[in-house]
Amino acid sequence: MALAQWPYLILALLSGLAVSGFPRNPSLLLGKRSLPGRAVDGIEVYSTKVNCKVTSRFAHNVVTTRAVNHANTAKEVSFDVELPKTAFITNFTLTIDGVTYPGKVKEKEVAKKQYEKAVSQGKTAGLVKASGRKLEKFTVSVNVAAGSKVTFELTYEELLKRHKGKYEMYLKVQPKQLVKHFEITVDIFEPQGISTLDAEASFITNDLLGSALTKSFSGKKGHVSFKPSLDQQRSCPTCTDSLLKGDFIITYDVNRESPANVQIVNGYFVHFFAPQGLPVVPKSVVFVIDVSGSMHGRKMEQTKDALLKILEDVKQDDYLNFILFSGDVTTWKDSLVPATPENIQEASKFVMDIQDRGMTNINDALLRGISMLNKAREEHTVPERSTSIIIMLTDGDANVGESRPEKIQENVRNAIGGKFPLYNLGFGNNLNYNFLENMALENHGLARRIYEDSDANLQLQGFYEEVANPLLTGVEVEYPQNAILDLTQNSYQHFYDGSEIVVAGRLADEDMNSFKAAVKGHGAINDLTFTEEVDMKEMEKALQERDYIFGDYIERLWAYLTIEQLLDKRKNAQGEEKEILTAQALELSLKYHFVTPLTSMVVTKPEDNENQTAIANKPGEGPLDAEEVPSMAYLTSYQAPQTPYYYVDGDPHFIIQIPEKDDAICFNIDEDPGTVLRLIQDPVTGLTVNGQIIGEKTGRSDSQTRRTYFGKLGIASAQMDFRIEVTRENITLWNGDSLSTFSWLDTVMVTQDGLSVMINRKKNMVVSFGDGVTFVVVLHQVWKKEPAHHDFLGFYVVNSRGMSAQTHGLLGQFFHPFDFQVSDVHPGSDPTKPDATMVVKNHQLTVTRGSQKDYRKDISVGRNVACWFVHNNGQGLIDGIHRDYIVPNLF
């Protein structure tokens, strides 16, 4: 199971003089300097608030800073936040003089193109980059006019992981100046009940903290508030410097009347498991230590100091050994030995005598350690009910013996065979951390970077403490067959004391009366099974404290866990498997608005008749991929490229969006139910799309008011001999003579060379042909007892770059550039919808201003799209007449 990463947040606000455009040197924005008073260069930060809501370990954090420019000229203001590496940004908004500019999460490839254009123009400023051990720095800068106000609001979410028996939230506070309204508010809601809650600050004495801090908890609720006055913020009674510079730490734990707790909201569930009071399972541990020349000096002394402290904590029931590697491999003992006082004393002397020397032979050292653990198990020289772990520490890359990372990974994977975990500790930055992480992950362990600081020995000790006390091995979390969908990881090699296993998923039947779960594992004495049964009505009562619950928190927790685990699996996947994992993680990231390694957040703000576009990326631990946007993202001043898109949805409304005009044209087609219309036909690529019309459940006598929709779509590729029939119930795929049928209740991805089909349960289907063509089919479901309307389909073309110039059809003809002019706007028969004259394709038409719905992102409500409506079935806009597009069947 994944071990804890402490959540961190650092707040800092910088201000500087405005410059023409934006500075070319990112350090102008990222450099820190002391700000002496409440206002600097005319910029006053008058409010900074951090609002954290924690519901069942899932934290929703909003950081809001407000500033005003008192100067007579425009100034540049920068907003700095450091957030946990384990967190996902979910939103950023910029509000200037009451106008709010929201952020949008997009696929990273889109941001990459914007970044490349920005670099070519030389207009860049830092936005997001990795910062320190557990942090990522978010920085955004904006020009603020004289007398204007600006508000920055950043939202991020993460799952708080249990670490040594507590959930911990670290807020690193650093406002850089006195702030009139400074406040941190944390509200915690835990259905199990809160057992402990504490808060402390490293930058203020307990006497001063007491009057600025309030903390309380009772039953399920906990509350912490830190609200220092201006005088309490001063570094001395007459100073204008702020003493708010350091850690604000909140820790808590929950009641554990039973080992497990299950919570269910809106068809999603989360299962927490953390038993207490179990005897510790004896362990066999092999320490594989790099003693190459690069470990010379301080690193070697810190490593030896940590190992000596670890030896003091090894339990007498444990077995251990040390393997040292440089250019060759040496061992303390030929085999594992029990941790008797005599052996511990001898091991301590061995550690003190370690000397650095030579090269780095990782492969042979790991294989020696694995062989030692396997042999001890096979020869029964260790207790039957014990577990094995291997811990490697290295500060560099393999450079002797087998040095190819992929071959070392293969050798280690085959040798371990899934029997025990490998933990890799990377000392410093001069190593291939991705290699260490990937090798650990595929062997049920994890990697941790050890930073070259004065506390490196404490970092090593702290890691060992996390794995020192296994309480269970071979943990399996089980649910009734066919009751659960989309389950996160439910199998773990170990459960360690002070940690917690978290599993989430979706109920197949939301109307069930009860829910059962079982956790099985091997204990120190016998095999254990922990069962939990939930009464759904009782669960509903227990979760009625809606004031503390933000939205569908369990669904978002499930999405967070799923994305995190998909990204971990993706690191070692190859070929088609990697493509599927990437597509699944990307789809969830976009759906739930998470900034992950596959997505970026883009904020666009009009300024000086240009668009200012901020792009926020998710950095990683490893070295930069040359093909990706750097982990430092950018704020650019240029017109972001826009892509036209086309769709038909509703009654059936055809909408053509034209970015060059910042406008749209729409028209209806009024035809009888059963009619099939040609939407797209490309004779070059062989792609066709046809749609069949359905009517209402009860016909209307007035044909002018009847409503029709698309009830069936046919998508075909002649070149690939591939067809898709989409109805309101099923999706059928033909690949030559092979047939596959899925329902709208499925979530599944089908891929082959040049094609991917992603079905998202009860929502939409995304079809991509290579990189140049993407269609989206949206499923609209109505209340089953609705007297008039059926379920129906919407069809969207979101990428048509791969279509040829010969493409035609009711939608396809508009893939080619065309122009239109609108003039003589005047009141129409409906006072809310003006009429106008449109000149298009050598026709002069009377059009009406109206709006249609875009349901791609919000199926239930949709987004209004303003458009000019062309009457009479699009006559004059479409080539020919609408009946020219009627075809006999779907294919």
Swiss-Prot record:
Record's subcellular location: Secreted
GO molecular function annotations of the record: serine-type endopeptidase inhibitor activity
Sugar attachment sites: N91
GO terms (BP aspect): hyaluronan metabolic process
Domain VIT: 29-158
InterPro entries reported for this sequence: ITI_HC_C, ITIH, VIT, VWF_A, vWFA_dom_sf
Annotated signal sequence range: 1-20
Propeptide: 21-34, 652-891
Modified residues (Aspartate 1-(chondroitin 4-sulfate)-ester): D651
GO cellular component: extracellular region
Swiss-Prot/TrEMBL keywords: Glycoprotein, Protease inhibitor, Proteoglycan, Secreted, Serine protease inhibitor, Signal
Gene3D superfamilies associated with the record: von Willebrand factor, type A domain
Domain of life: Eukaryota
Family: Belongs to the ITIH family.
Assembly notes: I-alpha-I plasma protease inhibitors are assembled from one or two heavy chains (H1, H2 or H3) and one light chain, bikunin. Inter-alpha-inhibitor (I-alpha-I) is composed of H1, H2 and bikunin, inter-alpha-like inhibitor (I-alpha-LI) of H2 and bikunin, and pre-alpha-inhibitor (P-alpha-I) of H3 and bikunin.
Role according to the record: May act as a carrier of hyaluronan in serum or as a binding protein between hyaluronan and other matrix protein, including those on cell surfaces in tissues to regulate the localization, synthesis and degradation of hyaluronan which are essential to cells undergoing biological processes.
Protein name from the UniProt record: Inter-alpha-trypsin inhibitor heavy chain H3
Organism annotation: Bos taurus (Bovine)
